């Protein structure tokens, strides 16, 4: 009889190469494997479970809604959609929202919206509309999102991709000034790059991008799919620079770890370019998704998880920056979104931490990304600090 790993690998596609660790249960900031070993989860499904694993309030919302109605086509109204729309729009200070399912769908929607806005509002010819993205970004792996990537290894073999995409170094406003022109319809960026290595831009960079967009009448798209909803100690990472984008992209923890839901938020002057037939989603905004998402947003507020991320994130960052290790190049982060950059490959050290009960994952080969659920408590944070210190100082 095949074991769990062989059984899974026999039928799985080969686009993932997971660690041989199979999880069977999760509660709060902790998970348990099939042998009942416990770990503090510092991956959080890449910020999907900001509210913690299996939060009872979110589960209750899912259970109750699933007994009423789960699916209503957007050809009709439902009793939940308007309530959810109002909640998320007020949170993001935007007038309109377009619900989708996954993060990459939100990015694809934003690309379409930006191009349509450029054609309708700026009168840019469809053949010459340009978008500027940042080097080191990650916006998804569907064709439109992939076209924004600056990493050739992600794109190789999948062409032809979207054209007229240009790249600037993240944090280099002078490069942006050279690239932007009257054919530019949008600049898209992550306020803090996640997959790229927990990269924090220089002070005022985001504000300068906003000013540049204003000068050229260009849309600023903030991809907060991973860093939004409290992860960095602010509800939105853009708040660190007191800057408003034209379009917010949200996903991941918007569904509380239970249901895929994403959102594209903008004011009416931008959103109105999408008219009936120009875009849609079979499952986007369904009653079950809305019920789950409303509960997920309530948990963020009622349990003060944004403040918890700020407070415990400061504690975590301070202690990690005090580790004395020749391996460490830099420890950087905001809130509970921290990167430990090493001068060697990070995978072995991640595996050592996992063996000691802290679940983590490397990115870009040499960076350990630490991003626990925002429900984590002080004792759990201190245990994370102890394990990381023990592994890296050794």
Swiss-Prot record:
SUPFAM superfamilies: PLP-dependent transferases. GO terms for molecular function: identical protein binding; ornithine aminotransferase activity; pyridoxal phosphate binding. Catalyzes the interconversion of ornithine to glutamate semialdehyde. The modification N6-(pyridoxal phosphate)lysine is found at residue 252. Pathway: Amino-acid biosynthesis; L-proline biosynthesis; L-glutamate 5-semialdehyde from L-ornithine: step 1/1. Keywords: Amino-acid biosynthesis, Aminotransferase, Cytoplasm, Proline biosynthesis, Pyridoxal phosphate, Transferase. GO terms for cellular component: cytoplasm. InterPro entries: AcOrn/SuccOrn_fam, Aminotrans_3, Aminotrans_3_PPA_site, Class-III_PLP-dep_AT, Orn_aminotrans, Ornith_aminotrans_bact, PyrdxlP-dep_Trfase, PyrdxlP-dep_Trfase_major. Gene3D superfamilies: Aspartate Aminotransferase, domain 1, Type I PLP-dependent aspartate aminotransferase-like (Major domain). This is Ornithine aminotransferase 1. It comes from Staphylococcus saprophyticus subsp. saprophyticus (strain ATCC 15305 / DSM 20229 / NCIMB 8711 / NCTC 7292 / S-41). It is found in: Cytoplasm. Its cofactor is pyridoxal 5'-phosphate. GO terms for biological process: arginine metabolic process; L-proline biosynthetic process. It catalyses: a 2-oxocarboxylate + L-ornithine = L-glutamate 5-semialdehyde + an L-alpha-amino acid. Belongs to the class-III pyridoxal-phosphate-dependent aminotransferase family. OAT subfamily. It comes from the Bacteria. Its EC number is 2.6.1.13.
